[in-house]
Structure formats: C-alpha cells, structure tokens
C-alpha cells in the first residue's frame, strides 16, 4: 500500500510517499515559497539532493507538481497516480472534535473549518491540501491526522485555564497541545526500543526544535503538555516567546499602541531565541555566537535550556516520578550540549547522563544515561510521517488507528 503523506504550510508543502507494508520511503521532498516568483521543489533522488525552480501559484499547483515529479520518467518512483492508495494529511488543530485520526469526508471538513478561529495560521492551509487532493485525485481516500488528538486524554485540571468558565463553555478556550503525532510516536517507540510496556510507565517526551513542546505520558496517554490553545505557550522557541505574563503583553500593547495582530506577530515571529539573542532563531548560529562571547546569545541559551528543565521537573512531580525522558526534534536529536545542560540540574531525581554516549549521539536511537541512572534518558528521532502513514493504513483497512 502506497501512502502519500502531506504537510501543508502557508507557503510550503512537504511530502513523503511511503510503501507502508514494507516500511519503505519511495520519495520525499517539498515545495517552498508557493505564490512567490522564486518558488522551488527540492527532493531526494537516490543519494542526490535536487532543487528545481518552479512557477507555482497555489497549493493545487504545488500538489500537481509533486504528483508530476512522482510519475516523471527522470525522477519518478511510480508509473501512474493510481499507484497512490491513500493520502494522509497532517492537520494541526482538531479542537475537542477529534481524539483520533479519521477518514476525511464532508462532515470532517466542516469540523476542520470550525477550528479556523483557534488555528487561523494552520488549519486553512491544511485544508488547502485536502481541497487540492480532492481536485487532483478525487477518487483517492484521504485521512486527517491531528496534532491535538493525542492530548485529548488530558484531564480537565490539566487543560483548563483559570479564566471565567464561560470562555471555555462558549468559545473552547483551553489547552489543546500540539506536536501530538510526534509525542505519540516517540513515547511508543521508546518503549519498543527499551523492551518495556507503556502500561505503568511514566514518560516525559521533549520535542525540542525551532518549535518545542514537552508532554507527560502516563500509561501511554498524554496527561499534560506545555503548549496551549495555540503553539505559542510553553517553552521558549526559535521565534515564539513561550510562557510570559499576559500583563506584560497588555502593558506593551497600551504603551506602544499595538494591535492584536501586531502582538500576534511579536510573540510568534519576533521573540524566543531570535528575539533575546538578536542573532538568529537557528541554534547553531546562536551557539557559535555564544562561544565567541556574545552575552545575549549566552543568555538566550541559558533561558532556553532552563525552561525545558523546569517543565521536565514539573511533569515529573505531576506524575509522581519519571521512568524515561525522551529527546526528539531537531535540537533534541542533534544538540548534545542542550541535552546535557537540561539534564544536569535533574541529578536530584536520579538522572545521570553518560557524557561520552551523549556527545557521540547525533540523532540516532540510543540511551544517553548511565547504567546506574534511576531514569532512562533516550534519544529517539521522531517520524511523524510514518505515524501518519500507519494511521492512514489502519483507517483504510477498517482498523482503529
């Protein structure tokens, strides 16, 4: 069964074609800068990485270009569109409407659109991908896999905000959490890797990259997570502020006469590592600047790492302990110094990092704690596309995802 996995952003489409029975990636790549004059497609072909300029005006055009590439004589891996059995979509926000992946139909589409209000930056472009497939491959079944679904097992005490209750009852204002597909994958995979059952295990999954979130997973279920109504809450991120006093935002809005749109832009695109360091949102560039003595770069790294440590400690307390800590995401998988600095203050909980194993690990599955550590600390590369493909396969075959 060949499953095309799509992740549509505002000006991009990432794709992966997976032969799911054999767990084999047939093709992967992405189109960027949709609607701009310098739009391009990049993809892997054998051991080569290829980039080509394209004239692409919208997501329909982008998906047509992807399908043309998949069936081209020069770079294709399939002969005909009919070899695509299903399409799995990453959908960012499912609100309280979806607690698992679903077959996309008119009713599901209507519910995705109902979430536009709480996910204005993400759901409309996810929907554009669904619409594009409906236009280009109308006979192919589609499945929606929601970032928020894994977190629907959180109890009310974890997801409610201490605001007047009517805003939850009438407007759905609550914590939803994100990166759920990644947290679900790594929390399951780490148990397979260690040869243990999820039942009875307390796991903290740290998805740390340009965006970042942490989830408390107990008995295989999410019971709390750091992101909130939107992906802005929680950790300090590349350009997102994470946790901040709402009073500080109101103060700035009043003093500088900022609109809600201005503030949305500030907390999402001008803050975080980039905002504090003044260097970049790229961890590699900030680390290089810090090594050269840039004080704001040093401060931004210290803030970034401290906030991860705080959430790990808080979630360990919430669960009454922790058995496994997992690092994933671009920084979590590849930045050994971040992992070490996050875990160092956790020694009081019995966390002991094996410095040699940690330094040697650059994105491979592996244990980076010592044999004597009371808590297993493990690096697990995330694979959201695989998870989306597996859910799609299950639904197409009539099984529970």
Predicted regions and their residues:
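Catalytic phosphate/nucleotide-handling subdomain of diverse soluble enzymes
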Residues: 218, 223-259, 265, 329-360
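Short beta-strand-loop/turn "lid" adjacent to the catalytic site in phosphate-handling enzymes
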Residues: 70, 74-122, 143, 149-158
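Phosphate/pyrophosphate-binding loops at sites that engage ATP/ADP/AMP, CoA/4′-phosphopantetheine
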Residues: 69-84, 190-197, 312-323
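Glycine-rich phosphate-binding loop of actin/hexokinase-like ATP-binding domains
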Residues: 150-255
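Adenine-nucleotide phosphate-binding core of ATP-dependent small-molecule kinases
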Residues: 265, 272-276, 283-318
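N-terminal glycine/serine-rich phosphate-binding loop of ATP-dependent small-molecule kinases
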Residues: 1-95
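Glycine-rich beta-strand-to-loop/alpha-helix junction loops that act as flexible
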Residues: 9, 89-92, 208-210, 322, ...
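Internal helix-turn-beta structural module
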Residues: 298, 302-322, 326, 332-401
């Amino acid at each position: 069964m060949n499953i095309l996995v799509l992740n549509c952003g505002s000006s991009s489409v990432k794709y992966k074609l997976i032969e799911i029975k054999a767990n084999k990636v047939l093709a992967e790549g992405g189109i960027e800068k949709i609607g701009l004059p310098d739009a391009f497609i990049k993809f892997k072909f054998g051991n080569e990485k290829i980039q080509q300029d394209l004239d692409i005006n919208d997501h329909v055009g982008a998906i047509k270009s992807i399908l043309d590439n998949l069936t081209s004589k020069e770079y294709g891996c399939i002969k005909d569109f009919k070899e695509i059995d299903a399409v799995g979509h990453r959908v960012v926000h499912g609100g309280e409407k979806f607690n698992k992946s679903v077959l996309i139909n008119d009713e599901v589409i209507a519910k995705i659109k109902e979430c536009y209000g709480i996910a204005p930056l993400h759901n409309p472009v996810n929907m554009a991908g669904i619409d594009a497939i409906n236009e280009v491959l109308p006979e192919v079944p589609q499945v929606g896999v929601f970032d928020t679904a894994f977190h629907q097992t959180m109890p009310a005490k974890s997801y409610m905000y201490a605001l007047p209750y009517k805003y939850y009852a009438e407007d759905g204002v609550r914590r939803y959490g994100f990166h759920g597909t990644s947290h679900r994958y790594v929390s399951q995979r780490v148990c397979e890797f260690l040869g243990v059952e999820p039942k009875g295990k307390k796991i903290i999954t740290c998805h740390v990259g340009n965006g970042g979130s942490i989830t408390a997973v107990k008995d295989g279920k999410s019971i709390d997570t750091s992101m909130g109504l939107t992906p802005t809450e929680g950790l300090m991120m590349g350009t997102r502020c994470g946790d901040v006093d709402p009073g500080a935002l109101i103060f700035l809005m009043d003093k500088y006469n900022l609109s809600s749109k201005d503030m949305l832009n500030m907390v999402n695109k001008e803050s975080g590592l980039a905002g504090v360091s003044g260097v970049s949102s790229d961890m590699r560039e900030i680390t290089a600047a810090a090594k050269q003595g840039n004080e704001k770069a040093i401060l931004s790294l210290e803030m970034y790492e401290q906030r991860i440590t705080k959430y790990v400690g808080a979630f360990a307390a919430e669960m009454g302990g922790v058995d496994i800590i997992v690092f994933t995401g671009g920084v979590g998988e590849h930045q050994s110094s971040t992992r070490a600095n996050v875990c160092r203050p956790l020694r009081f909980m019995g966390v002991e990092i094996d410095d040699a194993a940690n330094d040697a690990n650059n994105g491979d599955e592996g244990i980076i704690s010592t044999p004597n550590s009371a808590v297993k600390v493990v690096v697990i590369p995330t694979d959201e596309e695989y998870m989306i493909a597996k859910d799609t396969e299950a639904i197409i075959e009539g099984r529970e995802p």
